[in-house]
From Swiss-Prot:
Metal-binding found in the keyword field: no
Gene Ontology cellular component terms for the protein in this record: cytosol; Golgi apparatus; membrane; plasmodesma
Glycosylation (residues): R154
Recorded domain comment: The conserved DXD motif is involved in enzyme activity.
Protein name: UDP-arabinopyranose mutase 3
Length: 362
């Protein structure tokens, strides 16, 4: 595992244009090992669970801390779209941010090391991924052609070499892999030690299981679609929040002509969650995903949808019409999707209400 404190302080990229969003139910001691990489950035911490519990944050970080009472105060009746007792609550941080970019990480994710033993600056790599183009329309067999030491291979169309705007950078994990509960149960001791030094664009028309524990995106571009759904307390499903967002985001990025990257950077995922608890959360989703994925694979958004908000509302309508037949939960989820967009517009319009930082600065 990585040492507790890195000795190297890098020059921060985009420090005034990026927020780090962290959902948590516990003290954030893990930030100490990220201090050299995160200290000069602004943090948005979304406290899940009991709002009366005091969350301790190491001294020296610039942050806002929101709990459920703050979410209810800021959103009023629209707070119903934000999940409770589930890490899906992190998307509230996306909504109240005023920055162009978001990086979100879980509180059990530590600094990883590459095969040479060098600590990985995950945030820096995500930023590089977002600032360079993607290649969603034609696959380059050398993966990222914009990376140092790589280029487009023979046969790659010259007309496509400018690439597409990158909307999402999806990072990976060493140590504990992001498995579903059935896989956890049959492979309880499995660890991921395989470091693949590659970044690739997920091709247009291909879905992927997005994981929210090491994820960056262009908030101004795709933020309104980064809704992590209704999960956790009072809902018949959990642990599908990030994947639901990923399916929606990928369909919209394909429609808008934007790219989604996956691969580097790696973080060290420190602990496995309980597979029996996970199975209870995932049980319905294991069956529902067999209906949901074909739905997203077949969705075609009308050309009249020219903004992310329009695309997302169209998706919400289709979710209600098509997936509502699978289970009434999807009708509730579609309502949440619409409420999310209404709340996003309310907080992010030119005349929108400012979400006051409830705990000030540290």
């Amino acid at each position: 595992m990585a040492q507790l404190y890195s000795s190297v302080k890098p020059t921060p990229m985009l420090k005034d244009e990026l927020d780090i969003v962290i959902p948590t139910i516990r003290n954030l001691d893990f930030l100490e090992m990220w201090r050299p990489f995160f200290e000069q950035y602004h943090l948005i911490i979304v406290q899940d669970g009991d709002p009366s519990k005091v969350i301790n944050i190491p001294v020296g970080f610039d942050y806002e801390l929101y709990n459920r009472n703050d979410i209810n105060r800021i959103l009023g009746p629209k707070a119903s779209c934000i999940s409770f007792k589930d890490s899906a609550c992190r998307c509230f941080g996306y909504m109240v941010s005023k920055k162009k970019y978001i990086y979100t990480i879980d509180d059990d994710c530590f600094v990883a090391k590459d095969p040479t033993g060098k600590e990985i600056n995950a945030l820096e790599q995500h930023i590089k991924n977002l600032l360079s183009p993607s290649t969603p329309h034609f696959f380059n067999t050398l993966y990222d052609p914009y990376r140092d030491g790589a280029d487009f291979v023979r046969g790659y169309p010259f007309s496509m070499r400018e690439g597409a705007i990158t909307a999402v950078s999806h990072g990976l994990w060493l140590n504990i892999p992001d498995y579903d509960a059935p896989t956890q149960l049959v492979k309880p001791l499995e660890k991921n030690s395989r470091y693949v030094d590659a970044v690739m664009t997920i091709p247009k028309g291909t879905l992927f299981p997005m994981c929210g524990m090491n994820l960056a995106f262009d908030r101004e571009l795709i933020g309104p679609a980064m809704y992590f759904g209704l999960m956790g307390d009072g809902q018949p499903i959990g642990r599908y929040d990030d994947m639901w967002a990923g399916w929606c985001v990928k369909v919209i990025c394909d429609h808008m002509g934007w790219g989604v990257k996956t691969g580097l950077p790696y973080i060290w995922h420190s602990k496995a969650s309980n597979p029996f608890v996970n199975l209870k959360k995932e049980y319905n989703g294991i069956f529902w995903q067999e209906e949901a994925i074909p739905f997203f694979q077949s969705v075609t958004l009308p050309k009249e949808c020219t903004s992310v908000q329009q695309c997302y509302l169209e998706l919400a309508k289709l979710v209600r019409e098509k997936l509502g037949k699978v289970d009434p939960y999807f009708i509730t989820l579609a309502t949440g999707m619409v409420t999310w967009i209404e709340a996003w517009e309310e907080l992010n319009s030119a005349e929108g209400t400012e979400a006051e930082a409830p705990k000030g600065k540290n």
